[in-house]
Amino acid sequence: MLYQIYETQRTMMEPFVDFAQAAAKLYSNPLTPAGQNPLAQRVAAGYSLLYRLGKDYEKPSFGLNTVDVDGTSVAVHERIELDKPFCELRRFKRFTDDPGTLTRLKSHPVVLIVAPLSGHYATLLRDTVKTMLRDHKVYITDWKNARIVPLSEGKFDLDDYVNYVQEFIRHLQGAYGNCHVISVCQPTVPVLAAISLMASRGETTPLSMTMMGGPIDARKSPTAVNNLAMNKS
């Protein structure tokens, strides 16, 4: 029901969003009579804000075609390694014809970057992927927009999130022996849970687990949100 309401709202807003876009261009163009108005820039800014609030933002591409490895430009090919109902495991495979560079590429460690799911695209970490590609074999979780996932695929909750992370880790362990895991912001908690459960079962755990900017213990450095939760719960 929530997505139907959202889509209805977005559809109703489309004419206003299109008008706001056209008006912003009109008032920001100094060659038009409207653009000569002393208040034109303020009016254009208002319409531009309305347009940005209402527009539908499409997923950007990673656009990583080459990467510099020890001073050598190496081609990068992005492909889907695993395709799950709610997530794609993407691989950035590097290619080179230089024997020395190829040997170094093969010796590089494997890293799984777990990107945030809630409200973000994995391309948010484009620069992180680009940097890691210099000396790592890089994989990243590319979460699908839940809005386009068929209801027949069922629900997706924290347990499923943890299972996905474990499946991706096991896949890389099967292909390479083991891997490193980096979680950024929101996925730090499910990644910690996934690896902890693997350890409790006696499974091989990743070589390292890096958790960046995540709410592992939200009681530390409390914010207004923490205080609200403590007072109202």
Residue locations for each model-derived region?
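N-terminal cap/leader regions of alpha/beta-hydrolase-fold enzymes
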Residues: 1-233
